[in-house]
């Protein structure tokens, strides 16, 4: 035997050899009492181990080869009774739970069902809120705002000045346009004044323009057509007396202050 794990056939062969050796030892010991007992004990122990291994091997093979359902009728009946009792207990528990749920659902439906109150599903005139429904309750509202509004008033009275601009009446857009139309001067309208002479216009322009103003002063002499055109001395004296300058002398140069 070279393998460390011998097969069952090798174990049977080894067991037969051990038996034969033990038998020889027994016969020898009877003849020769000086025989070594250690050899006898060793063979006996080896035989015990071999037989134990063979028995475990046979038990394993029998368990695999046998039918696992091959049980006695008594054991099968006991197991069937136990399973039926367990299933019955589970069914009883499930029925009790279902019964409790149905009772709760019926109570819930009865509480909210409309059979007890026929007017529950219809909205009648009595269901609407009236003032009579609130007669039993006393509602008190504090419109003053308490101390909070007083503090706000005191703050604004100290930190702000009264502005009466927003208290006056504000005109509408049409009224404002009417007022603007009345206040603006009408430049295109002709004044209903009598026609003035050339001398009056000259005096008006001289009065309006002063020496301290920046506007240029133009003085243009107009030669009057008289009967005495040859009298140059009279013209010069009239120019000096009038305070004007002849047109031929400065060609209407502007005199600024």
From Swiss-Prot:
Which InterPro entries has this protein been placed in?
Ecm13-like
Compositionally biased residues, Acidic residues: 105-120, 127-140, 228-242
Q: Which domain of life is it from?
A: Eukaryota
Q: Where is the composition biased (Basic and acidic residues)?
A: 92-104
Q: Where is this region: Disordered?
A: 88-140, 222-257
Q: Which UniProt keywords apply?
A: Cell wall biogenesis/degradation
Q: Which GO terms describe its biological process?
A: cell wall organization
Q: Give the protein's biological function.
A: May be involved in cell wall organization and biogenesis.
Return the PANTHER family for the record. PROTEIN ECM13
What is the name attached to this protein's record? Answer: Protein ECM13
Q: Which organism is it from?
A: Saccharomyces cerevisiae (strain ATCC 204508 / S288c)
What gene does the UniProt entry assign to this protein? Answer: ECM13
